[in-house]
Design a protein with these regions (language model features):
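Extreme N-terminal tail/first-helix region
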Residues: 1-23
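Charged, gly/pro-rich active-site loop segments
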Residues: 2-9, 85-137
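A generic structural signal for nonpolar/aromatic side chains embedded in well-ordered alpha-helices
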Residues: 22, 68-69, 119
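Short beta-strand segments
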Residues: 25-61, 69, 77
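Generic structural signal for secondary-structure transition and capping sites
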Residues: 26-27, 74, 124, 128
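Short, solvent-exposed aromatic-acidic interface loops
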Residues: 59-64, 120
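Active-site-adjacent structural patch at catalytic or cofactor/ligand-binding sites
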Residues: 59-61, 71-84, 93-104
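A short, polar/proline- and glycine-enriched secondary-structure boundary/capping micro-motif
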Residues: 65-71, 88-89
Length: 137
């Protein structure tokens, strides 16, 4: 279904490291099929639910990204770590996790509230600020 990484034995990181990147990174790049089938990639905040194996994005209900996902739910999402330069090498090494999937909105209001609260706790320093932001949403 998906191409194998070229030279994967030298470049691929273990799944555990990819999951750690998804759990620890604050932002990633979401790529969708945009207008006239041009790729459209945009930095986004997200929350990774490791137990469910799902990635949640927060978004407005309208706009280029949302319209694109409604037309074609296939997406690609990438997160990456800090560059590291190894001894005697000129190029930085960057660990990344690339995830393919299909986007769908969270329809159930209670599920949406729970996901939004967990999402907010990732970005806000305390629960009161997270609750305040959710109320504004």
């Amino acid at each position: 279904m998906f191409r194998k990484m070229r030279r994967a034995e030298k470049k691929a990181i273990p799944n555990e490291e990819a999951i750690r990147l998804l759990q620890e990174s604050k932002r990633g790049v979401l790529a969708v099929t945009g207008d006239d089938d041009y790729p459209y990639a945009v930095p986004v905040n997200y929350y990774y639910d490791a137990a469910a194996g799902k990635i949640y994005f927060h978004s407005s209900l309208a706009g280029h990204k949302v319209d694109a996902m409604k037309r074609n739910p296939k997406i690609c999402f990438t997160v990456y770590g800090e560059p590291e330069i190894k001894d005697l090498d000129w190029a930085p090494y960057v660990k990344s996790a690339v995830v393919f999937g299909k986007a769908q909105p969270v329809a159930d209001p209670e599920k949406k509230r729970v996901v939004l609260k967990t999402f907010a706790m990732k970005y806000y320093p305390n629960e009161a600020e997270a609750d305040e932001e959710i109320e504004l949403d």
